[in-house]
Amino acid sequence: MFAFFESLRGLTILSVCFRFLLATGCGAAIGYERSKNHHAAGLRTHIVVCIGAASVMLLNEYLLAYFNPIADPARLGAQVISGIGFLGAGTIVITGHQRGQQIKGLTTAAGLWASACMGLLVGSGFYEASIIMCCFLFGVIALLNQVDQKYLKTSAVVRVYIEYTAEAPFSVILTALRQEHWHVTHME
């Protein structure tokens, strides 16, 4: 199996096609799970990020091989890693107020960043690491999500955010909550 990968390490049309195909598959594996759970960055986004990162590493190899033997092959990859942070930041949403804040989208942002890193591995020709990373990343995102939903997200505490603009006194809402045996611990 490793001999197969060795034959694809150079810059040939076959190796370029294989790298983009592998980047598509790795990005799709992670993106599928995100799409299935209705997250902002899903299948297409993860594939595009992974292919884009792979293309940057291919460009690095090409520039190093054909134009400048003293070029820094990590420079463009470093820009991908820092630049993807801006895309990931756009998926993070903070809801609520100071005490009841919820942050959503961190796993999506981290998944995009990791997909970019996975694409850099693919683009550099480090196939074994990219396949192993894809398996671990999928396991963490998909399988641990089930553990999270089953064991960590179940709680007897419910946070409710209500914006009240009606003319009736707020005590009407509090009375209704108490009749349902809800305990209000904090109000602003």
Regions found by a protein language model. Give the residues of each.
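Alpha-helical transmembrane segments and their membrane-interface boundaries
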Residues: 1-72, 76
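Lipid-exposed faces of alpha-helical membrane segments in multi-pass integral membrane proteins
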Residues: 18-25, 52, 81, 132, ...
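C-terminal ends of transmembrane helices
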Residues: 27-39, 87-100, 146
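Small-residue-rich segments of transmembrane alpha-helices in multi-pass membrane proteins
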Residues: 48-58, 82, 107-121, 164-167
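Juxtamembrane membrane-interface segments at transmembrane alpha-helix termini
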Residues: 57-64, 117-123, 142-151
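Ligand-binding beta-strand-loop-alpha-helix segment within the catalytic cores
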Residues: 61, 77-89
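Structural signal for the N-terminal portions of transmembrane helices
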Residues: 70-76, 95, 101-142
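Canonical alpha-helical transmembrane segment with a positive-inside/aromatic-interface signature
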Residues: 100-101, 126-188
